[in-house]
Amino acid sequence: GQGSLAYPGLRTQGNLETLSGPNDATRGLTSLADTFEHVIEELLDEQQVIQPSKENKDADLYSTRVMLSSQVPLEPPLLFLLEEYKNYLDAANMSMRVRRHSDPARRGELSVCDSTSEWVTAAEKKTAVDMSGATVTVLEKVPVPKGQLKQYFYETKCSSKGYAKEGCRGIDKRYWNSQCRTTQSFVRALTMDNKKRVG
């Protein structure tokens, strides 16, 4: 059927209620898979529209890796997953039709360096350096009208197993030295400076 507006800027292309037979069901599931991919691509296109310009550097600080919650989040952040998917598509640089059949797991692809990701709190790292170079205290708990929420960070770091000590995959060790290292990045988070200002 004709698409309907589910969210601003997102169009659905089919539903299971319009199906009548077993062959239609198979086509419907394929249609739903296509719709899901289409929705993800539209979300990513929307994100590109609001990409920061040189005049709006504050938008660079938007983070997909920080969450306020009363308990440890069970899943990676949705925007982080969308970002990973977008990076994969950009790197592959393929047409839509080829993308559907290009899951890296199917082709046996491996990352250059093994990594692990998990949610952590400020209990593990109480201080940080802000973009102006000042040391700030990272708030572990944030007061809200009905109690407190913890500030969680989705941290990705090199795996202690695997190739971290032996070098990176795909590098010819006869001619090149390589090393997998965890790097630091800026994220938008709630902190307190030495004058007790929270921001």
Swiss-Prot record:
UniProt keyword Glycoprotein present: yes
A GO MF term: growth factor activity
Name of protein: Neurotrophic factor BDNF precursor form
Residue positions with a glycan: 93
UniProt organism field: Eunectes notaeus (Yellow anaconda)
Family per similarity comment: Belongs to the NGF-beta family.
Record's compositionally biased regions (Polar residues): 12-23
Phylogenetic classification of the source organism: Eukaryota, Metazoa, Chordata, Craniata, Vertebrata
Function, in words: Promotes the survival of neuronal populations that are all located either in the central nervous system or directly connected to it.
Disulfide bonds: 113-180
